[in-house]
Amino acid sequence: MKRYTGLLAALTLTAGMALQAQTNEFVIQTKKLGAEIQPTMYGLFFEDINYAADGGLYAELVKNRSFEFPQHLMGWKTFGNVTLQDDGPFERNPHYVRLADPGHPHKHTGLDNEGIFGIGVKAGEEYRFSVWARLPQGGTSEKIRIELVDTKSMGEHHAFATETLTVDSKEWKKYQVILKPGITDPKSTLRIFLASKGTVDLEHVSLFPVDTWKGHENGLRKDLAQALADIKPGVFRFPGGCIVEGTDLATRYDWKKSVGPVENR
């Protein structure tokens, strides 16, 4: 009995010493002042409501680019043989679309994206289209066609910027191409369709202006960000407002999920 009592005492002492070793000190030097804060200093805070981020400060032009909205095809209109899949390459964003031959020589398979209140583009500016894609059935290559479409031209859908991408791998890979529209259209549509007879999977579809604020790829809309910078705020709070708490604990703003490769955020 004495042996067990001694062992217990030794363990208790060891645990106490371990806890004591983890003690940290925080020293406040009350007589050493830091930078003086002016009572007239003003600042900004960013609350992600009313399209302040997507459709606002963030320069992405595609709505629901990873098919992860609660309604997975919100913002998209499909035509032909399009199916939604849920075993994609990105853990946090597993949904993607599969484009297959429509089975008719005069029909196409594809999808249109409406953007957020339309996809606004300017004549002569460059826009980077990118997509993760693969050939699920193997093969050497398949082609997809990318178009910016004016849906208001005399009741017809007129494509005013077009490019073709060749998907050449059965593994997921990022592809990109530059679109340069010849006209200015504040409410165009992005159209993507299969331009060959096989099957292609598409994930994380993006259309981004090349000319962003300070030239950052995947960056901020140049005019809005510069307008905020010109205010010269003393502080910038992010996240700001009540949206930080979400509607419940599961939907709270978790910054750890907003870093890393953009396709897996």
What are these regions (language model features)?
Residues 8-16:
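Bacterial N-terminal signal peptides
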Residues 1-8:
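Bacterial N-terminal signal peptides that target proteins for export
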Residues 22-265:
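Extracellular and organelle-lumenal recognition/adhesion modules and their flexible linkers in secreted
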Residues 17-21:
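Sec/Tat signal peptide C-region and signal peptidase I cleavage site
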